[in-house]
Amino acid sequence: MNEQYSAMRSNVSMLGTLLGDTIKEALGENILDKVETIRKLSKSSRAGNEKHRQELLTTLQNLSNDELLPVARAFSQFLNLTNTAEQYHTISPHGEAASNPAQLSSAFKRLKESKDLSERDIRDAVESLSIELVLTAHPTEITRRTLIHKLVEVNTCLKQLDHNDLADYERNQVMRRLRQLIAQSWHTDEIRKIRPTPVDEAKWGFAVVENSLWEGVPAFLRELDEQLEQAFGYRLPVDAVPVRFTSWMGGDRDGNPNVTAEVTRHVLLLSRWKAADLFLRDIQVLVSELSMSECTPELLELAGGSEVQEPYRAIMKSLRSQLSCTLSYLEARLTGEERLPPKDLLITNEQLWEPLHACYQSLKTCGMGIIADGSLLDTLRRVRCFGVPLVRIDVRQESTRHTDALAEITRYLGLGDYESWSESDKQAFLIRELSSKRPLLPRYWEPSADTKEVLDTCRVIAKAPQGSIAAYVISMARTPSDVLAVQLLLKEAGCPFALPVAPLFETLDDLNNADDVMTQLLSIDWYRGFIQGKQMVMIGYSDSAKDAGVMAASWAQYRAQDALIKTCEKAGIALTLFHGRGGSIGRGGAPAHAALLSQPPGSLKGGLRVTEQGEMIRFKYGLPDVTISSLALYTGAILEANLLPPPEPKQEWHEVMDELSRVSCDMYRGYVRENPDFVPYFRAATPELELGKLPLGSRPAKRRPNGGVESLRAIPWIFAWTQNRLMLPAWLGAGAGLQKVVDDGKQEQLEEMCRNWPFFSTRIGMLEMVFAKADLWLAEYYDQRLVEEKLWPLGKQLRDQLAADINIVLAISNDDHLMADLPWIAESIALRNVYTDPLNVLQAELLHRSRQQKQPDADLELALMVTIAGVAAGMRNTG
C-alpha cells in the first residue's frame, strides 16, 4: 500500500507542477507565487503550526477581489486532478482497492472454504445473481461534462506513463498531451451557466453508458468468467448477465415540475435511439470479423440458403440494415415527424438476440469457440444488459399527486371526495374499480392541468414498449391505498402489463409502519393475484436521516427491512428491496462491501437494486477499469451476503440499538426542530441560500419555496453542511446515544457489537470517516466570519458535541486515532485536506463579502461557485 501511495503522491505532485506552469503562463508569476505560498501555509497549518494557520487566514482575507477567482480556481482544479490520480491509482472513491481481480478471487476463496456450501449452492447463487444499478441525476455531480472528458483523458495519460518501456520521445509526447489537457481545463469555465434540463441529465446518463459501461460490463463479465473457471471450473451461461442499468433521469418527477409526460416520452425515444446507434457500431465490427463460411445447416437456412457464401456476414448485414432503419425512424420521431414505423422496427431484445445467438451456437458447434467468445459474446451480453431500451426508466411520483387526481375524478362523477374518505373506504373503492371491466374515466371530461399530467404520464407508460419502464416508485407512501391508487391509474391508462409498483418509505414513522402497510396489502386477494409472487419496496435513506438523525434512521431502515423480509418469506413473496442511498453518509452512503454485508440476513435474496447518484456515478463507473472494480465489489459482497449471511443479532443488541436510536433522535430533533436559533444559524453558517443559485440539477432545491429545514430536499441540506466542514447531518445525535449507553455501563457490549455485528461496525466506521473529514477550526472560522454573535453559543455547543462524539467513537473502537483500520482512506483525506482548507477559508471570505454587497457582484458569485465545486471535489461524497 505504501508503494502505491508514493506512486500516487508523485503523480499528484507532477500534475500539480503542470497546473502551476499553466497558471504561470496564463496569469504570470505573481499569482502562482501567491498560490504556492497559500499551499505551503495550508500544509503547515494541517501539521499543527498555529502561527502559519493565522498567516493562512490573513493571506486569504487580504486577497483583492481580482485575486479571489484565480486562487479559488487553482485549488479547485488541483483537487479534480488529485481525484483523477487517486482514481487511477486503484484507490476508488471510498478507499476500496479498484480494478483488482483479487476481490472476486478472494470472495470465491472464502466461499469455497466454507464447510456448509456445496459447489452447486455457489453455482446457483452466481446464476441467480441480480445487480440493478439505478442511475439518478442528482445535483451533486458538480463537475461539467466537458471537464470530465478531459479528466478521463488525463487518466489515460497516467496509464501510458506507467509503461516502463516508453521511449523518451513517447514519454515527451504523453507529457505534452497532459500539458495540453491541463491548459484546456484551466481555460474552460468549470461552472455551468445554465441549469440542465431533464433531457440534458438523461443525455449525461447515456454518455456514461457509451463512454464507460458499454466496454466495462462485458470486460467485467470476462473477468467474472475467468475467476469462476479458476475457482470452480465453470463459466457463466451466455444468457446470464447479472447486471442491469435503470435510470431516473427523465422519469423522476417527484418535486420536479420540469419532468413532464412529454419529457419522459422524449427520453424513452432518445434512449432507444442511442441503443440502436451503439449496437450498429457493434454490428459493423462483427460484419468485418465474422468472415467464416463453415456453419450449421440451421444457420445457413437463417442466412438465406445454400447460395450464401459468408452466412455470418449475411446475417450481420441484415441486422445492420434493420438497425439503420430503426435509427432513422427514431430520429424522425425525435424531431417531431410523424412517420409509419418500418416493418422490421427493432422493439424487443429478442429481435437482436436470436440472430446473434444463432451465429454464436453455430460457431461453437463448428469448432470456432474462440471466435464465438470474442466480440460476438460481448455484443450478446450487451443485448442482455442494455438491450433495445439501453437503460430502463423508473417513473417516480409523490403519493399525494395520485390522491388528488382520484379525488378530482370521484368529485366529477358525484361519488364524493376520495381524499376525505377513510383508508378502508378508499381500499374498497379501489379494489372494486380494479376488479371492474368498465372504465372509470368519463369520456369527454377535461381534468385540471395537474391531474392531466398524472394521467398523461400513465398513458406514456402504457404505450412504451414492454421492458422499457422498470418500475413505478411512489414517494412518501404511507398506506396500502397509495399503492392501489397507482395500479388503478395504470389500468385506466390501458397499461397492458403488470408493472412493478414500489412504495417508498422514507420518514422515521413511515419506516416504522412499512411492515404493517405491506402486511395489509398482501392480505388483499386481488393484489396477491395481480403481483404474481413478486414485490418491490424502496427504502429511503436520505429523508429518514434528515427527519431523525443518522443513527435513528439507520436502525429504522434495518428494522423495516428485517420485518419486510420475514413478512414476505412467510407469504411466499419474492421481495426486492430497493435502496435509495446517496454518496454522503447522511444519505446512506457507505463503502459498497461494508454497506451490503451490514444489512439484515436475507435482504439480498431478491438481488440488489440501489440508486447510484450524482458524482458517485463518475467515481464508480466513469472509466471501464473502475466499472470492473465496482461491479466486482458488488458481486463478491452479494454472493457472500446470500451464501454466508451475518448471524441474527442478539436480542440485547436490539435493545441497545433501540435505546441508542431513541436518545440520538431526541437530541437531533432537539436541535433541528425545537431550537428556535437553529434555522437562522444554519442559514448563516453555511452557503445554503447561495447553493440555490448553482445551476446544478433540474430539480428545485426545495419542495416548498418558503418552508424551513423540513421543506429542504435532503441533498442541499447535506451539501450545505459538507461545505462548512461541520458535516452535521452525518453525526448529530449518534455520539450522544453512544455516550448514554456507555454511561449505563454497557461499553463492553458496544465493543462486542463492533466486533461481531457488521451492521453496527459499519455505522461506527461511517462515523469515523465523517469525523476525519469534519473540521472544528474551519467550522469555527465560518461562525466568526458569517454568523451574528448572539448565535455563536449554538455553534460552540455543536462543535463541543462533535469533539465529544469523536472521543466516544475512539473509545468504543479502541483506537488512538480515526480510520486506524483504513489507512488508505485516512491518507487520501489528508492529501486532499491541504487543498480543501484554503477553499473553505476562501469560501467563508467570499460569503462574507457577497453578503455585504448591496448589488450582486458577478465575479464574487463566480468565485464562490468555484469554491463550492472545489470543496465538493475535496470532500468527495457531497450529497
From Swiss-Prot:
Listed cofactors: Mg(2+)
GO molecular function: magnesium ion binding; phosphoenolpyruvate carboxylase activity
Pfam assignment, any one: PEPcase
Reaction equations catalysed: oxaloacetate + phosphate = phosphoenolpyruvate + hydrogencarbonate
InterPro entries: PEP_COase, PEP_COase_bac/pln-type, PEP_COase_Lys_AS, PEPCASE_His_AS, Pyrv/PenolPyrv_kinase-like_dom
Entry GO terms, CC: cytosol
Disulphide-bonded residues: none
Biological processes, Gene Ontology terms: carbon fixation; oxaloacetate metabolic process; tricarboxylic acid cycle
Cleavable signal peptide: none
EC number: 4.1.1.31
Keywords for the protein's UniProt record, in alphabetical order: Carbon dioxide fixation, Lyase, Magnesium
Catalytic residues of the enzyme: 138, 546
Keyword Transmembrane part of the UniProt annotation: no
Family listed: Belongs to the PEPCase type 1 family.
UniProt function note: Forms oxaloacetate, a four-carbon dicarboxylic acid source for the tricarboxylic acid cycle.
Name under which the protein is recorded: Phosphoenolpyruvate carboxylase
Organism: Pectobacterium atrosepticum (strain SCRI 1043 / ATCC BAA-672)
Underlying gene: ppc
